[in-house]
Amino acid sequence: MQDDQKKTTDFGFKEIPTDEKVKAVAQVFHSVAAKYDIMNDLMSGGIHRLWKRHTISQSGVRAGNCVLDIAGGTGDLTVKFSRLVGSEGQVILADINDSMLKVGRDKLANQGIVGNVKFVQANAEALPFPDDTFDCITIAFGLRNVTDKSKALASMYRVLKPGGRLLVLEFSKPESELLSQVYDQYSFRLLPAMGKLIANDADSYRYLAESIRMHPDQETLKGMMDEVGFERTSYQNLTGGIVALHKGFKF
């Protein structure tokens, strides 16, 4: 957990001044934005689409709801949510990175999804929305890049309606030692090489692999959600714990 007085924080395996992390992460995503979707498909063999589909199925979102998709990037979840909430509902795709927002906005416009979706550049630690606004909040593969994760979770709790739920889809800790070893080899050898080949950027993908290892494990993240007020918190391991879906409610 981050402390307001802490002067340094992790950036992958490096320690950098806390006030520099937002800029450093922004540079990574400015670099990868244009190739983000194709790299996701290549890196996961397309499995990320199944993880996201499962997240949607656990959201409870229905017609007329108001949904916040934090770190929504290129809009994979927003596309699905826009269809679920219909013309009477709204989805806000929020991302701190304007390059990712532009890719997401263009992608959705090309699919004709414009009426019930709004794009907002926002920091998850200080969400610019009133209290008790959203029926559901999701953050998929974004929380590990946030500097102060507890502050971000508290901000999400504040803007969630009573009765609403938060879903956090994120890389986590594999359940078996063998899977962990195989995953390490893939992450630190193959992933940067793919980044270099496809996006001409090995360093950004090396950071993404390192950031996964620095992210809190399943039980730690569940505890962090409990601490800021979420109730009935739980998590489900997907693909052997390579990814976990955390769920929490506000009552």
Swiss-Prot record:
Q: Do you know which Pfam families this protein is assigned to?
A: Ubie_methyltran
**Which SUPFAM superfamilies does the record associate with it?**
S-adenosyl-L-methionine-dependent methyltransferases
User: What are the alphabetically sorted keywords of the record?
Assistant: Menaquinone biosynthesis, Methyltransferase, S-adenosyl-L-methionine, Transferase, Ubiquinone biosynthesis
Query: What GO annotations for molecular function exist for this entry?
Result: 2-methoxy-6-polyprenyl-1,4-benzoquinol methyltransferase activity; demethylmenaquinone methyltransferase activity
Reaction(s) this enzyme catalyzes, per UniProt? a 2-demethylmenaquinol + S-adenosyl-L-methionine = a menaquinol + S-adenosyl-L-homocysteine + H(+); a 2-methoxy-6-(all-trans-polyprenyl)benzene-1,4-diol + S-adenosyl-L-methionine = a 5-methoxy-2-methyl-3-(all-trans-polyprenyl)benzene-1,4-diol + S-adenosyl-L-homocysteine + H(+)
Q: Which PANTHER family match?
A: 2-METHOXY-6-POLYPRENYL-1,4-BENZOQUINOL METHYLASE, MITOCHONDRIAL, METHYLTRANSFERASE
The name under which this protein is listed is Ubiquinone/menaquinone biosynthesis C-methyltransferase UbiE
